[in-house]
Amino acid sequence: MNYDVVIVGACTAGTYFANLLVKEGLKVLVIDRDSEETLAKRLDIIHFTRDSYEQFGVEPSNEGDEEFVRNFNVCYGKSALNNHLKTNYINVAVLHLPLFIKRLRKTAIENGAEFRFGTAFQKLRYEDGRIAGIITTGGEEIKARMVVDASGISAVVRRSLRDPYMEAFETGPRDKFYVLLKYVKLKDPNVQVVDSTSWPYYKGWIAPQHTPGGAIIGVGANLSFDYARKCMAKFEAAIPLPEYELQYEEMACTPYRRPPFSFVTDGFLVIGDAACLTKPINGEGIPSAWVQCTPAAKIVADALKDGGYPTREKLWEINRLYQTGEGAAYAGERAMLIGAVDMTPEDNDFLYKNGIIFKSDDEPECKNLLFALLKGVIAGQFSVKALISLVSATIKGNDLKKHYQKYPDDPLLYPAWAEKAFWLWNKAGSMADTVKDA
């Protein structure tokens, strides 16, 4: 059977994008190697901002819906020394991820999308030298004018491509966060975790879960799950968390690196975790992927209309829209955060005390970063090493942001832009560079 689009991967990015495409009148097949019963079972609970429902046209999850647990509306932050509470008001829904995906899939199917589980991608299918579908591990040929990689961190389709406009890098141990979650029962019945509190210095947090009197204690770390467990011990030794009994643990990975410089080439688009689309401050991926997907659906539909083939040129606007918007903002933030965590707990405490980088909603923005940091150095509250690290990282982040805002309109100008972007990212380094105790 022929399709307009085949999507490899049926989690949040692939399922959401499928629904957008069928609403544009396209014939869409979504495949996933997992069974429907085991899909996305690596994590149970997620925290999803309620503003995202309206932003992305998704029916809100409410009490009585099987995926819904509860809402909360405050996210707190504290320094490495557990001081200077920051308060940010964000409406958040606590959801069961597998059931949330199930509801997204139900909507997509009702709108005309097809799903097949237990079906794995083996290689791309070509006609006249152009992508024309996929071949499964079972040897089945699925014809389609366009292929979308939503396969997650493995990025099985993107990594199989050999194309000057598509990077085939692997998201390795230095390029992702290994997330360790402890589901716990609090010993004191008078202590309730009803909102989220994070300690960014330790990449640690405590947040609500689905059982009464319970909480989730989590950390994220580069390199390995073993190192994440070491970071968890360091976090719990430094921060006085409520006493608890461990119920069970979950472990998963999220990309933590720059996305590909181009998401498209002839007959192809990469989205979601396969494109390393996550929020630098906390690793959240669903809204970041959907920011890319929302305009991309109309661009893909236009490229495929009247039986047309989706060339790189027709799809290029997907690149430009994302990279000059969220891509530019996140490039700057990702580079700056490298400097923000590469310091001592005392340095981090100074940032919190003065609302530098980490601030409450009602605190003013720091107008002159260098002046504020120099005052800290003179007062003996902020180290010269941290000053150099943070100012350098901020400059590198600003350079990256400005470069992304100049993303080329024409694919012919892409190689020169990408060459400079490589150079800027090599200067900025990686969050894994800050690891000193692995």
Descriptions of predicted regions:
Residues 121-123, 141, 225-305, 310-325:
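FAD/FMN-dependent oxidoreductases across multiple families
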Residues 33-75:
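N-terminal FAD cofactor-binding segment of flavoenzymes
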Residues 10, 109-242, 276:
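Predominantly flavin-linked oxidoreductase catalytic cores and closely associated redox partners
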Residues 6-8, 22-42:
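Glycine-rich FAD pyrophosphate-binding loop
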Residues 86-107, 156, 222-230:
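Short beta-strand to alpha-helix junction loop
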Residues 301-438:
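C-terminal helical "tail/cap" subdomain of flavin- and related membrane-associated enzymes
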Residues 1-13:
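Beta1/beta-strand and adjacent pyrophosphate-binding region of the FAD-binding site
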Residues 42-45, 94, 203-205, 275-287:
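Glycine-rich phosphate/pyrophosphate-binding beta-alpha loops
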